[in-house]
């Protein structure tokens, strides 16, 4: 496989995203790494502005514009919105290359903290959520620095601390394993998706939420799949165009969900008419047995037979990742997460 730097990928328009994001060559192009556990992305540069998305710590973003202490960014999904400048570590393309090549950890706990010392009784530096990415702190011999059941870490902005060892995995090894399982053992991978989704049960709904703190409907599907090494677009209206289309037979007010497999996405919304196109406004994840999990007021499980809304269609993600035209890319093969 040819090796490309992050700068070269930007210049050549080879940023392989879920929606085929391409960046144009520009000597003034700026990048940053998210430095908060779940950075709030707003539609306008104002704290009163609508929340549109969240970006997780360690995620590389492109800087598009500045207005006061607000910065307009583009995320890997891609999603464009405004964040506070203090939630970013601004870096040159060369520094981004080094970040993408450096040994890193991914947080596998739903919620945890970075501590100043290897002890839960010490002061904490930052909170963490599932999917946050941190630099490894290494000893002189290149081995990870570990103390008393904790691993030493560094945030994108350079703050150092400790996280419990059982709450982190090597990022590259994790991404390799997720990709390998998805390709070689899809049934196990589907079960992994459902186990991850079940961890969100009871999490409050929040419009724009895309973390274990709060999620909206598409934020749940996006976060569950990311936690298993797959990048989905941000919104339901985009996710409905990814993967393989699955027609859900409907007769009157009854829908036959038996055509779906675990891990398939189910979409509801406005059916196409002569005047208006189809529009997905809600999404859930099939968990088998005629049930699905979704975020509606809070994350919960519903039985399809008692759910009154008629679905638009299903989409099969597993087995379609990294395929041309699928609109889906694995974390391991994304140049926003690893130097390819």
What annotation goes with each model-predicted range?
Residues 1-10:
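Bacterial N-terminal signal peptides that target proteins for export
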Residues 34-63, 107-142, 205:
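Beta-loop motif signature
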